[in-house]
Amino acid sequence: MISAAVEPHVDAFKPDNREPLTPDFATTGKAPGAQRQHNPNKRKILFVTSEIADLVKTGGLGDVSAALPRALAHLHDVRVLIPGYRQVMESDNPIHIVGELGGHAALPPCKIGRMDMADGLVIYVLICPELYQRDGTPYGANNGRDWPDNHIRFARLGLAAAEIAAGEGKIHWTPEVVHAHDWPAGLAPAYMHWRGLNTPTLFTIHNLAYQGVYSRGCSPELAIPEHAMQQEGMEFYGKLSFLKAGLAYSSHITTVSATYAREITTPEFGCGLDGFLASKAQQGLLGGIPNGIDESWDSATDKHLQHNFSINDWEGKARNTQEVRELFGLDDSEGPLFAVVSRLVYQKGLDLTLGVADYIVEQGGQIAIIGRGEPEEEQAMRELALRHPGRIGVRIGFNETDARRMFAGSDFLLMPSRYEPCGLSQMYAQRFGSLPVARNTGGLADTIECGVTGFLFNESTVESYREALSRAFYVYGKKDLLNAMRCLSMTQPFNWCQAVEPYARLYEDLVKQTQLSHY
């Protein structure tokens, strides 16, 4: 609604032992969104993102873009810039026009709207109907195909961030740090660099595999200077990459876990950018800060659950298990229930789950699968369920309530990801007493303690996966051990206060470094 080769040194940015930032936040883990206190030392931080869970979300990026600004609110004045998709423009939150931006090359003029959320978060909406107000997702049509003009759509987002940083648009607020997220925001640091702006920039990689690669011929319509098409710039194997632009021109780079920050400097995980990223790491310009999860992930109070439970009362857990069995058409069973809550794509290692499914069933287990993704993966899951009626159930699609009930009702969560920058599902599952069986990679390695809060396996092979599953079956047969592991997993500190201090220190360091460079 509108009204007018060498092991790189990667800094993990681990929280230090200084006094808590605010007593209530440190003890409760709650981001004091609406209770925004006056802090004369607040820095102005602009988040640039293609999605935010309040309004439009396709994955973990949307969750982080919604939660992290709120978690930082008591320390900094954090605002979010997002395209004015149809879902955004048609939300119940009023949008007030606060500024205008002119066109440049093929990037059209647009307006800037301001949306004030109930808890005080300010969202700037980039209003350009010809680019953003379409049916579908932020990235493509409902048929799954990317919009052919995505290079223009997200270049406009990056340019808008640079214009706001330059004080254009007359919104009467100028950021001291611009924090861009993933490839759709990758041109924000680049446009700022090309304009000679001194505002420091931070670029966060949520998934290196998505790189926003386009033809070099797009450069003129995006106003990309010729000198940028060099190896040290945004050139990527003869094409241009929005993600590499963010890496090349930002003041600092973070990923969403310390292990992933190390992994992406290697050929196995670097997606063709390992050498470039290893160089950044050796310069001290790459680090990992883990994501947190929202406080609503509490099995004792979650309103999505019909049967709440806690480490002192397991009855609700058993009732949730029965509910999930009924939802997926599974037989009554004394065996363990394994859950898959995932995008059905190659990255998630679902072919490995197909390879161990017979073993799980033979050992007396059941599998409930929910998700959507590639048509071939979806069909493979359907066929798997047909082979094992009453033992394996599949629901193609995604529903927040059903997902939460699966975490609450399952005994184990299957996450055989080939790579996992951070991962949220394993944290959700642990909070609800479902022990992850996961590959030892990325954020999974950082958030699961093998044999204590879950089970890890090293190789992307059926054999390695099966060995971890055998350990899970063993623990399931030892109820005292099972409940002890559940208790430990449910009390893990996965809230956002783990990320607030390192981000706050990093913003301050970036501002001070910029100030010192001008003395």
Curated annotation (Swiss-Prot):
Entries under CDD domains matching the protein: GT5_Glycogen_synthase_DULL1-like
Biological process according to GO: glycogen biosynthetic process
SUPFAM superfamilies per UniProt: UDP-Glycosyltransferase/glycogen phosphorylase
Disordered, as annotated region: 1-40
EC number: 2.4.1.21
Keyword NADP: no
Binding site for ADP-alpha-D-glucose: 57
Pathway given in the UniProt record: Glycan biosynthesis; glycogen biosynthesis
Gene Ontology MF terms in the entry: alpha-1,4-glucan glucosyltransferase (ADP-glucose donor) activity; alpha-1,4-glucan glucosyltransferase (UDP-glucose donor) activity
A Pfam family of this chain: Glycos_transf_1
Keyword Glycosyltransferase tagged: yes
Reactions listed under catalytic activity: [(1->4)-alpha-D-glucosyl](n) + ADP-alpha-D-glucose = [(1->4)-alpha-D-glucosyl](n+1) + ADP + H(+)
Biased composition range(s): Basic and acidic residues: 8-21
Keyword set, alphabetical order: Glycogen biosynthesis, Glycosyltransferase, Transferase
PANTHER family to which the protein is assigned, alphabetical: GLYCOGEN SYNTHASE, GRANULE-BOUND STARCH SYNTHASE 1, CHLOROPLASTIC/AMYLOPLASTIC
Family: Belongs to the glycosyltransferase 1 family. Bacterial/plant glycogen synthase subfamily.
Function: Synthesizes alpha-1,4-glucan chains using ADP-glucose.
Protein name: Glycogen synthase
Species for this entry: Pseudomonas putida (strain ATCC 47054 / DSM 6125 / CFBP 8728 / NCIMB 11950 / KT2440)
